[in-house]
């Protein structure tokens, strides 16, 4: 079967007149376990970072190399999250919006403009704009995606040490065959998202 041609998106032109621009991205909407993690990053135009790209398109080695560089060179960065309990109460979309609000609120410098990956934006006290495929088109969003991805992966590796039978270090909590098999054999843990279908089925509440 012929491979679908990839659609080239035009470079995103950042609107003029904004001095402090934050990029925001999330990691962890799809997993069955753990927090949804977001990051907000304001880059320093005088300290460029080479090699920024969507965290999912970078090797783990490259992400881990860029992670401290972003932390050191950025004017400001912050992480926001929502717990599995909050996800179950709010739903994953609303929880992601809240986590993004928390990330932006955590910045030590207030941005003039916030650029958010995707097509939805949370309510924020400053101007914000959604950017489709922003993690590929906007350096600030790329940096945020790397921060969020590395932090969430580290948290899954820590959870793996607590519950090695689930294999969280490998699948990062995503709904893989190995994760389903572990749930079937060992049940669910406190950090599982009880509102997600496979977890509900394992608990017999669907």
Curated annotation (Swiss-Prot):
Which biological process terms from the Gene Ontology are attached to this UniProt entry? DNA replication, removal of RNA primer; mismatch repair
Reported EC number(s) for this entry are 3.1.26.4
| Cited InterPro entries | RNase_HII (IPR022898), RNase_HII/HIII (IPR001352), RNase_HII/HIII_dom (IPR024567), RNaseH-like_sf (IPR012337), RNaseH_sf (IPR036397)
Annotated catalysed reactions: Endonucleolytic cleavage to 5'-phosphomonoester
Cofactor binding mode and count = Manganese or magnesium. Binds 1 divalent metal ion per monomer in the absence of substrate. May bind a second metal ion after substrate binding.
Which family does the record assign? Belongs to the RNase HII family.
Q: Which HAMAP family match?
A: RNase_HII_B (MF_00052_B)
Q: What is this protein called?
A: Ribonuclease HII
Query: What gene is this protein translated from?
Result: rnhB
